[in-house]
Amino acid sequence: MSPWEAKWIRHSDVRPFPQPEPMTVEEKVAVMLKPELHLSSGCHPYPAVNDLGETNGGLKTTGAPSGMCKGSGWGSQFTVDTHHLEASGPSCTRGTFQKTCRRHTSGIATTGST
């Protein structure tokens, strides 16, 4: 496989990257406040790419919005961006919600130490 060729694998076969050791103050705070996502409807998030560069082929667009998509069992991946606004340093959590037709899903991101 050449480095620019995409290799698609089943969405349930992608294992997330291990969490790297936090180095900066922002990274340490992000780990301390580790976001959790609670979904009341729709599909659970799946990791998008693994450490070999193999990409999640996505979910089928047919069937119920929350059917057969309750997570891979390997865990998920989230990107947390921190931006210092005044002295507060809030963070924004991003995630991809697949197989949803609604603009606003029922996911709630919360933070708390674990």
UniProtKB/Swiss-Prot annotation:
Keyword Secreted among record annotations: yes
Function per UniProt: Probable secreted effector that may act as a pathogen-associated molecular pattern (PAMP) recognized by the plant immune system. Seems not to induce necrosis, neither in several susceptible or resistant Vitis species nor in the dicot model plant Nicotiana benthamiana.
Protein name: NLP effector protein 1
Induction of the gene: Expression is strongly induced during the first 24 hours of host infection. Levels increase from the time point on when germ tubes enter the leaf and the maximum expression level is reached during the formation of first haustoria. Thereafter, expression decreases during branching of hyphae.
Stored InterPro entries: NPP1
Annotated compartments: Secreted; Host cytoplasm
Keywords: Host cytoplasm, Secreted, Virulence
A cellular component annotation (GO) from this entry: extracellular region
Domain-related comment: The structure of NLP effectors is remarkably conserved with a high level of conservation of a central region containing the conserved undecapeptide motif AIMYAWYFPKD and heptapeptide motif GHRHDWE.
Pfam families, sorted: NPP1
Domain of life: Eukaryota
Family statement: Belongs to the Necrosis inducing protein (NPP1) family.
